[in-house]
Amino acid sequence: MLDLFADEAPWQEPLAPGAVVLRRFAFRAAQSLLDDIGFVASQSPFRQMVTPGGYTMSVAMTNCGALGWTTDRHGYCYAVRDPLTDKPWPALPLSFASVCRQAAIAAGYASFQPDACLINRYAPGAKLSLHQDKDEPDLRAPIVSVSLGVPAVFQFGGLRRSDPIQRILLEHGDIVVWGGESRLFYHGIQPLKAGFHPMTGEFRYNLTFRQAAEKE
């Protein structure tokens, strides 16, 4: 499909205190990001993880960076090795680090130093239920989340699961950054509607950058 807004400059949309949507911020870097997703997946394949409750997640996942987020029947944790390959996770690609760094600065988090990137692949119908990101030791560090491919509806709530939910359509190249007062806000992705993007086919990809190690 022809993108009538391909040359439009990125812009910002405030989401909550400490949170912002950076529209089209990763648009020009998208092909490099997707190429590097392919490389990471060739080393640590996508897989559907099983939660401690025995639920198989609909989203396929892999990781890169010094630490990778994983889950099994014993709980959620960050690990230095991929449990599927028993090898260290692939290094954070330069394209990932560059986009994340620029987005963090644009959102007001210039000191952010990510060491973990969770890569999510959504097929039609895949979703991510409302949750908080609280497995990290330093909750002062923000989250940087990059969207690529088929559009998805991002849900962003508050500190309680019962708080009102904002629903924001995220499109190819959009980035959401949240920290500060909103760092522990509940968030998720509604079931992905069937669609097509010329760079990703039926899929949506998401890169979620976090600081997962203890700062010295």
Swiss-Prot record:
BP terms from Gene Ontology: DNA alkylation repair; oxidative RNA demethylation; RNA repair
Binding locations of 2-oxoglutarate: 120-122, 204-210
Cofactor(s), by name: Fe(2+)
Domain Fe2OG dioxygenase: 113-213
UniProt-annotated binding residues for substrate: 69, 76-78, 135, 161
Top enzyme category: oxidoreductase
PROSITE patterns, per database record: FE2OG_OXY (PS51471)
Catalytic reaction equation(s): a methylated nucleobase within DNA + 2-oxoglutarate + O2 = a nucleobase within DNA + formaldehyde + succinate + CO2
Record has DNA repair as a keyword: yes
Gene Ontology MF terms in the entry: broad specificity oxidative DNA demethylase activity; ferrous iron binding; oxidative RNA demethylase activity
Gene3D superfamilies: Alpha-ketoglutarate-dependent dioxygenase AlkB-like (2.60.120.590)
Keyword Iron recorded: yes
Coiled-coil stretches noted in the UniProt entry, renumbered to this chain: none
One Pfam family recorded for the sequence: 2OG-FeII_Oxy_2
Amino acids binding Fe cation: 131, 133, 187
Cellular component GO terms held in the UniProt record: cytoplasm
Cofactor: record remark: Binds 1 Fe(2+) ion per subunit.
Domain of life: Bacteria
Keyword line: Dioxygenase, DNA damage, DNA repair, Iron, Metal-binding, Oxidoreductase
InterPro entries: Alkb, AlkB-like, AlkB-like_sf, Oxoglu/Fe-dep_dioxygenase_dom
EC number(s) stated in the UniProt entry for this protein: 1.14.11.33
NCBIfam families assigned to the protein according to its UniProt record, in alphabetical order: PRK15401.1
Role summary: Dioxygenase that repairs alkylated DNA and RNA containing 3-methylcytosine or 1-methyladenine by oxidative demethylation. Has highest activity towards 3-methylcytosine. Has lower activity towards alkylated DNA containing ethenoadenine, and no detectable activity towards 1-methylguanine or 3-methylthymine. Accepts double-stranded and single-stranded substrates. Requires molecular oxygen, alpha-ketoglutarate and iron. Provides extensive resistance to alkylating agents such as MMS and DMS (SN2 agents), but not to MMNG and MNU (SN1 agents).
Similarity-based family: Belongs to the alkB family.
Protein name: Alpha-ketoglutarate-dependent dioxygenase AlkB
Origin species: Salmonella typhimurium (strain LT2 / SGSC1412 / ATCC 700720)
